[in-house]
Amino acid sequence: MHSLSWFLLVIGLSVGLSSGKWNEKNSVIFTNSLGRNKVLKVNCISNDDNLGFHFLRHGQTYDFSFHDSLFKSEFYCDLWQGPNFKLHAAFTAYEGGGLIVHYGKKNFWDVRDDGIYFTHGQKMPKLEYTWK
């Protein structure tokens, strides 16, 4: 029994150390690519947190990081396009957890005049949402 415990400990450490992403946080990143004088207003919430309002000038980014929950991780975000903040978009910016727990997953949202574009970083961003 003693040797089995050592064996399991060595295997566990080997797997943990060989996979550098096993404890890396997931991230959601917003970039304001709107016109020069347009401010982006962002508010994201989850079941546990309200991350508050963030105002981004052209070219600025806002990001937050977290670990997936064992049940479900979901961040719902509202975006408004300034200066009058009349144009709005609302969507789920991140969904994960449950049976499949993600480590190091990155959701990039590029906010443009014609809509909100999405990528995980490996491909060109694609238009996902339009302004209402």
Swiss-Prot record:
Report the InterPro entries cross-referenced here: Self-incomp_S1
GO cellular component terms, A-Z: extracellular region
Can the keyword Iron be found in this entry's annotation?
Answer: no
User: Where expressed (tissue)?
Assistant: Mostly expressed in seedlings, stems, leaves and floral tissues, and, to a lower extent, in roots.
For this UniProt record, give its keywords in alphabetical order, as a comma-separated list.
Secreted, Self-incompatibility, Signal
Q: Where is the signal peptide?
A: 1-20
Q: Which Pfam families match?
A: Self-incomp_S1
The keyword Transmembrane helix is assigned to this record: no
Per UniProt, subcellular location reads as: Secreted
- Any single GO BP term: rejection of self pollen
Superkingdom of source = Eukaryota
Q: Which family does it belong to?
A: Belongs to the plant self-incompatibility (S1) protein family.
PANTHER family in the cross-refs: PTHR31232, S-PROTEIN HOMOLOG 8
What is the recorded name of this protein? S-protein homolog 8
Species source reads Arabidopsis thaliana
Please state the gene responsible for encoding this protein.
SPH8
